[in-house]
Curated annotation (Swiss-Prot):
Residues 2-68 form the Mop domain. The keyword Ribosomal protein does not apply. This is Molybdenum-pterin-binding protein 3. It comes from Clostridium pasteurianum. Keywords: Molybdenum.
């Protein structure tokens, strides 16, 4: 699959915390840094996401939130 987004981070899923409708997915990227995303349970199922899965996080610059 080819996409135009330039902000892509490859890594391995190190945690999946499922809620009622969504799940928190933690991806460990190069250098040991972690990226956390909230995605739907349907997406978890469709993509086969589980601990150990190799994934690429695609980040749209207009959808970034910074927490302090």
């Amino acid at each position: 699959m080819s996409i135009s987004a330039r902000n892509q981070l490859k890594g391995k899923v190190v945690a999946v915390k499922k809620g009622l409708v969504t799940a928190e997915v933690v991806l460990e990227i190069a250098g040991g840094d972690k990226v956390t995303s909230i995605i739907s349970l349907d997406s978890i199922e469709d993509l086969g996401v589980k601990e150990g899965t190799e994934l690429t996080a695609v980040i749209k610059s207009t959808d970034v939130m910074i927490l302090a």
